[in-house]
């Protein structure tokens, strides 16, 4: 897995507090997206402020290094943009979504919602399943993406969102 920070594209709509994050691939720009195989779901689903999250546990350092390279590129590119826009005078740090665990690393992921409905594909044994029926301690293959970042309390924030989950 390789990531080129020079392909990060940042769009901003006047009056919004969010920066749209895209990755230039040929003639098109798409969300930064990648797959994590065989990740553990140690805690099941968490709910915070009416938002739903799943913490993944990953043992393979390759995934963490890839995420860290994305975070470093995003931090640098967005800091430059925020400086150009006059919103900051010094570089700002990106709030990572990765933290160390006993067995590897935790990655906090968000279950995307649109109009009070979950916007994610969840499959088990070839059949669609409700994301709310996920058990803690299970395993799955996740496709994650980033779509927006924002500045809050002097830090850059973002969330990995789940595009697709195939339970093992």
What residue spans do the PLM features occupy?
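Extended serine/threonine-enriched, polar tracts that run as long, contiguous segments within proteins
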Residues: 101-167
């Amino acid at each position: 897995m390789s990531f080129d920070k020079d392909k990060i594209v940042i769009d901003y709509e006047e009056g919004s507090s969010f920066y749209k994050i895209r990755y230039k691939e040929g003639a098109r720009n798409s969300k930064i997206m990648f797959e994590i195989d065989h990740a553990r779901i140690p805690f099941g689903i968490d709910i915070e402020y009416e938002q739903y999250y799943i913490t993944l546990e990953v043992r393979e350092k390759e995934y963490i290094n890839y995420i860290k390279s994305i975070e470093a590129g995003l931090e640098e590119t967005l800091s430059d943009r925020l400086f150009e826009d006059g919103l900051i005078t010094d570089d700002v740090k990106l709030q990572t979504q990765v933290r160390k665990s006993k067995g590897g690393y935790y990655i906090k992921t968000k279950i995307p919602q649109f109009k009070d409905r979950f916007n994610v594909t969840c499959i088990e044994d070839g059949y669609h399943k409700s994301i709310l029926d996920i058990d803690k301690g299970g395993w799955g293959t996740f496709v994650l993406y980033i779509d927006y970042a924002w500045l809050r309390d002097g830090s850059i924030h973002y969330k990995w969102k789940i595009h697709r989950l195939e339970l093992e």
